């Protein structure tokens, strides 16, 4: 029973922080999701490297992941040019690709796969939440708050998890 109560209060605290950061401002939203992106990529790469075959530079991947999230956030909020924001990320990917091909690792293909998988499977969905929150859609009025779609998404995910 004690374990259940600890889990319950932890879940309530996490939900409260997530809803509050989403509701307050675009900056708190970005801060929370930037932190979630970094932690998720770190955990994902830790799981992949557990068997010993994959050896990816986690700090480098975390920096690249945070940049991708930040580029989507800036693109959604400030409507800066996609070229200006995403060319540095493409150069980062090219650097990682070349670095891995010329490294002395025994499995460079596994490492490249882990890098690409971490960016597409973990970072891209978290980064695209910015497009949901700050995108300009014709079906919504201009007075609709930015947090309406992400909070609705949270509710649907929580209801789905609870019902499963």
Question: Positions of the model-derived regions?
Answer:
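Membrane-embedded alpha-helical bundles of polytopic integral membrane proteins
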Residues: 1-164
């Amino acid at each position: 029973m004690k374990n259940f109560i600890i889990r319950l209060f932890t879940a309530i605290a996490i939900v409260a922080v997530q809803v509050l950061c989403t509701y307050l401002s675009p900056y708190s939203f970005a801060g929370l999701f930037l932190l979630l992106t970094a932690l998720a990529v770190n955990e994902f790469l830790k799981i992949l490297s557990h068997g010993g075959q994959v050896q990816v530079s986690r700090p480098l991947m975390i920096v690249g992941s945070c940049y991708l999230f930040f580029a989507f956030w800036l693109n959604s909020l400030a409507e800066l040019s996609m070229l200006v924001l995403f060319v540095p990320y493409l150069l980062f990917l090219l650097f990682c690709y070349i670095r891995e091909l010329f490294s002395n690792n025994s499995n460079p293909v596994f490492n490249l796969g882990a890098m690409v998988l971490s960016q597409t499977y973990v970072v891209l969905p978290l980064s695209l939440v910015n497009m949901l929150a700050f995108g300009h859609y014709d079906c919504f009025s201009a007075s609709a708050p930015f947090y309406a779609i992400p909070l609705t998404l949270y509710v649907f995910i929580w209801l789905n998890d609870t019902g499963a």
